[in-house]
Amino acid sequence: MASIRELHQQLVSKERSAKEITQDALEKIQQLEPKVHAFLTLTAEQALAQAERVDQQIATGTEIGLLAGIPIAIKDNLCTKGIPTTCGSKILQGFIPPYESTVTSRLAAAGAVMVGKTNLDEFAMGSSTENSAYQLTANPWDLQRVPGGSSGGSAAAVAAGETLIALGSDTGGSIRQPASFCGVVGLKPTYGLVSRYGLVAYASSLDQIGPFATNVEDAALLLGAIAGHDPQDSTSLNVPIPDYTQFLIPDLKGKKIGIIQETYGEGLDPQVEQVTHKAIQQLEELGAEVREISCPRFRYGLPTYYIIAPSEASANLARYDGVKYGFRSPDPENLLSMYTRTRAEGFGPEVKRRIMIGTYALSAGYYDAYYLKAQKVRTLIKQDFEAAFEQVDVLVCPTAPTTAFAAGAKTADPLSMYLSDLMTIPVNLAGLPGLSLPCGFDQQGLPIGLQLIGNVLREDLVFQVAYAYEQATPWHDRHPQL
């Protein structure tokens, strides 16, 4: 599979045109979609028009950026003007946004070619992409298994080679966990590094947009294109954005890496434990100083998240009422009946469950006991990370406690589904950057991801460690046979 730089070289040397690259991607999608089902909407016409614009620039001698002419898939909770944005929900069936998200605007300005919108768990709530109202996405490594979630469509599209890069969103692990399950690179940036303007909100204090790629450099290039201050997002950080590729050095001498003790133990698949331990040994061989670090409140991340995220979701999802856009229940008796029936018929069971949990946690009698307490624990989790980063540069642990599970295996038991984000959730609560990269396979040939966690705005260190490991191992060159 080519990298962004290789495709860029082919474009500037006129070996291939952007139109040819786009046509190849669209053909591959047509060929593989009956098996993978990663896309909800294909934007072939717009993609070819964008590719032709890039070809015109090349023909007139205009210098093009590295992302110009590169096919990309976009998770379907990012607003794209004039193109359906469903969030995987029946309640937004037929919704066409009148405006563009900041990240997709930046990608269009960079010349990237959007080939389509990818499937997701409804409103990004889920860990398997089985909560989509539209279709089930398959894991390209084993079509009977889930790709992870909620950004399962984006992860599967990149793993299958339907597209080189993709965007996802991550509220509690929705980029990193599917990246682990599908054997690709996935990054959740520092909270506020990438604008959320035009991202349909799930939990606003946790949501963050990030890249999927087949290798670390492509992820770094994509982050560089979407990161940066945006006055349209009040939580956007006003910090300079470096060229992240300058930190890709295959040497870890002097780097201090901490293994989070609390991530090893009960609930961790022994094969995941074995493979990630081997990966950590490899980091040591590359010159890093590795030690064990305790984050005592790490295991409280899951219950804390399942109070805070549903509370924010119950407020954010109050806006879907059938009045202005999306689905409206037919023939309601009156206004109140229209509201209740639209929401009852439009939302799926997991979204309803989380709205109920959130409404309960925010109710007068329980606010202090649940929501306020969860916010206090969130602060303690942040403090554990702060203490850890006084001792080490980067923290490491498995991305997910297991490899990809069979479709339908966990749908009847929401709690077992929630546990698949055990390792990723604390990173969102603390607003830190976290990257998952492939580090091996289990005995069934399913990918395993290693999670690298950096301090606030230390994507540079995360990329450096990830790149050094990637260059010393063969995992990023392994692709599923479809």
From Swiss-Prot:
EC number of this enzyme: 6.3.5.7
Give the GO terms filed under biological process for this record. Answer: translation
Keyword Magnesium (UniProt): no
* Subunit structure, as described in the record: Heterotrimer of A, B and C subunits.
**Species of the source:** Cyanothece sp. (strain PCC 7425 / ATCC 29141)
Q: Which reaction does it catalyse?
A: L-glutamyl-tRNA(Gln) + L-glutamine + ATP + H2O = L-glutaminyl-tRNA(Gln) + L-glutamate + ADP + phosphate + H(+)
InterPro entries assigned to the protein according to its UniProt record, in alphabetical order: Amidase, Amidase_CS, Amidase_dom, AS_sf, GatA
For this entry, the protein name equals Glutamyl-tRNA(Gln) amidotransferase subunit A
Q: What Pfam families does the entry give? A: Amidase (PF01425)
Taxonomy, superkingdom:
Bacteria
The molecular function terms in GO held by this entry are: ATP binding; glutaminyl-tRNA synthase (glutamine-hydrolyzing) activity
* Keyword list, A-Z: ATP-binding, Ligase, Nucleotide-binding, Protein biosynthesis
The UniProt entry annotates the active site at K75 (charge relay system), S150 (charge relay system), S174 (acyl-ester intermediate)
How is this protein annotated for GO cellular component? glutamyl-tRNA(Gln) amidotransferase complex
Please describe what this protein does: Allows the formation of correctly charged Gln-tRNA(Gln) through the transamidation of misacylated Glu-tRNA(Gln) in organisms which lack glutaminyl-tRNA synthetase. The reaction takes place in the presence of glutamine and ATP through an activated gamma-phospho-Glu-tRNA(Gln).
Q: What family name appears in the similarity comment?
A: Belongs to the amidase family. GatA subfamily.
